[in-house]
């Protein structure tokens, strides 16, 4: 009986730890690592202090079509396409790196992430199975997540044509005055400096706008 490589097992544990820290569900861990369910549960409890949540994973593509989730998902998937095409790593590693960049961009915009790691992983699986496609907005030229086989010639994204109540949530109403007062006191050159530093930290990674419109 061949003995299992200690190095490979260590890599699997490292990957599982990274996924758990990013909020992965147990089903994702089972699908992407070779560790047993019992070991994954123990690892999850050790890292999070609680048992992994139960229940089924998201299985509908409709969530990705709603207004805010759609452009967050579109941002992530365009990052993922770049990473998958140029990163030279496994699919799950591309997902992790892309998700970290997605979180970074959201933080730069002083926003909160809408897309969880499990949703991002599910999104990639939906694309791989042919259930979703990227459609090009005829106004801004950005590429956005859409149902497979939807007509593309007249597609307009939710940013160019937002629904009537887009962004009008209770939380947005509570935080808007704070954001407005904060923005009023920031010198005009600060956003450019912050973006330049973020770009330098990412080395050759594209900017936010590049991810949305990049052709791979």
From Swiss-Prot:
Family named by the database record: Belongs to the FlhC family.
Binding site residues for Zn(2+): 137, 140, 157, 160
Descriptive protein name: Flagellar transcriptional regulator FlhC
Organism superkingdom: Bacteria
Annotated cofactor note: Binds 1 zinc ion per subunit.
Subunit annotation: Heterohexamer composed of two FlhC and four FlhD subunits. Each FlhC binds a FlhD dimer, forming a heterotrimer, and a hexamer assembles by dimerization of two heterotrimers.
Entry coiled-coil feature ranges: none
High-level lineage: Bacteria, Pseudomonadati, Pseudomonadota, Betaproteobacteria, Burkholderiales
Cofactor(s) in the UniProt record: Zn(2+)
């Amino acid at each position: 009986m061949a003995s299992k490589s200690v190095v490979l097992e260590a890599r699997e544990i490292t990957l599982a730890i990274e996924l758990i820290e990013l909020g992965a569900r147990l089903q994702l861990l089972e699908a992407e690592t070779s560790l047993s369910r019992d070991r994954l549960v123990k690892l999850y409890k050790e890292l999070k202090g609680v048992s992994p949540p139960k229940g089924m994973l998201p299985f509908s593509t409709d969530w990705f079509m709603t207004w805010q989730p759609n452009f967050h998902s579109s941002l992530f998937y365009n990052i993922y396409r770049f990473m998958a095409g140029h990163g030279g790593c496994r699919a799950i590693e591309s997902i992790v790196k892309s998700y970290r960049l997605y979180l970074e961009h959201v933080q730069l915009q002083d926003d909160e992430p809408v897309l969880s790691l499990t949703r991002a992983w599910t999104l990639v699986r939906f694309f791989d199975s042919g259930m979703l496609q990227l459609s090009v907005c005829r106004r801004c030229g950005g590429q956005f997540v859409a149902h497979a086989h939807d007509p593309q010639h007249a597609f307009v994204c939710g940013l160019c044509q937002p629904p009537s109540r887009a962004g009008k949530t209770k939380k947005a109403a509570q935080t808007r005055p704070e954001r407005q007062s904060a923005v009023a006191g920031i010198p005009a050159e600060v956003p450019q400096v912050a973006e330049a530093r973020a770009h330098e930290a990412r080395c050759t990674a594209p900017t936010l706008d590049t991810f949305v419109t990049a052709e791979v």
